[in-house]
Design a protein with these regions (language model features):
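Active-site-proximal beta-alpha core segment in soluble small-molecule metabolic enzymes
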Residues: 1-124
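Short acidic, glycine/serine/threonine-rich loops at helix termini
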Residues: 13-15, 37-38, 55-60, 98-100, ...
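Acidic/histidine-enriched ion/cofactor-binding microenvironments in catalytic or ligand-binding pockets
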Residues: 38, 110, 119-122, 144-156, ...
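Structural alpha-helical segments in enzyme catalytic/regulatory domains
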Residues: 72-80, 148-160
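Glycine-rich beta-strand-to-loop/alpha-helix junction loops that act as flexible
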Residues: 91-92, 125-135, 169-171
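Short, electropositive alpha-helical surface patch
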Residues: 97-111, 139-150, 180-190
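Charged (often Lys/Glu-rich) extended helix/loop segments that serve as interaction or gating elements
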Residues: 148, 160-294
């Protein structure tokens, strides 16, 4: 287990120690002092900044040390008699540039060399996540990112004794595991420029699973059951169930006409959806049903 949040509540550091969770990341001097105080025998992993300009979700504005800062942090860790065993990075969510992994791995090797100069025996590389959950989520095929990672590791880490690489591909595993099924609970029809325009009120919205629209940059593809291929399409807006007008799922999309009680669905919807749903306005998150296919 690696405690991969670079900035941790002191109570959580103490709890990690009681559970024998020794591996944890850091990216600043303050964190080193906390670890020294609450978990002095931790195995530390230094998180570095990356070039995440090609990613939809950018993390380096919040986490990670520059190479210059990394050198100072390694020296500080040495003076505090703390053990740094490796380097971590995250190229950002939904990475569309495979070369970002190459650059980050190259920079990680520079940090390994800094550690060696200070008597640190580094052997762990955590390449984070950033992998797409399904094919339509990234401009770069998953295989291309894998090749860039493997080539870079072969180039920059082929001489590190007992070298170990780990990753955190959360979206990659979670996305395809869930299909969201949600229901039309209300309907309005307007005439706009001589054409019908439908507004539907659904039993889930941005305070539920569709929070991913606001916080994860997702653009869900909504489909309806029992729709024929040649059904006429109409301009459509879908709202969530709450009293907030911001609770809008789609606006101006083209869908067939739906009825109250009709069911819609979104495939590949397991990542950063239900996990962040809330009870806002008294609406509870939707229930999850598990289906085993044989």
């Amino acid at each position: 287990i690696i405690y991969a949040n670079p900035v941790k509540d002191p109570h959580y550091i103490k709890f990690a120690r009681t559970q024998n969770v020794d591996m944890m990341t850091f990216d600043c001097e303050c964190e080193l002092y906390k670890v020294k105080l609450y978990h002095p025998y931790a195995k530390l992993v230094l998180r570095i900044k990356t070039d995440d300009s090609g990613s939809v979700l950018k993390f380096s504005t919040k986490f990670g040390a520059s190479l210059e800062e990394a050198k100072t942090l390694i020296e500080k860790a040495k003076s505090l008699e703390l053990d740094i065993i490796g380097v971590s990075f995250h190229v950002g969510g939904k990475c569309n540039d495979a070369s970002a992994y190459t650059k980050a791995i190259k920079n990680a090797r520079e940090v390994f060399d800094m550690g060696k100069q200070n008597g640190m025996n580094m052997y762990l590389l955590d390449i984070g996540g950033g992998f797409p959950g399904h094919e339509s989520e990234s401009e770069v095929p998953f295989e291309e990112s894998c090749k860039a990672i493997n080539d870079a590791i072969d180039t920059y880490f082929n001489d590190i004794p007992n070298f170990r690489a780990i990753a955190e591909p959360g979206r990659f595993f979670a996305s395809k595991s869930h299909t969201l099924v949600f229901n039309v609970i209300g309907k309005k029809k307007q005439i706009v420029n001589g054409e019908p325009y439908f507004s539907y009120y659904m039993n889930d919205g941005i305070y539920g699973c569709f929070n991913c629209i606001m916080f994860d940059g997702q653009k869900p593809e909504i489909k309806a059951f029992h729709i024929k291929e040649n059904d006429k399409l109409y301009k459509t807006t879908m709202f969530g169930p709450t009293c907030d007008s911001v609770d809008t799922i789609i606006r101006g999309a083209e869908l067939p006409e739906l009825c109250v009680g009709e069911w819609c669905f979104v495939e590949n919807f397991g990542a950063y959806t239900q996990a962040a749903a809330s009870n806002f306005n008294g609406f509870t998150p939707i229930e999850c049903f598990y289906i085993l296919r044989y």
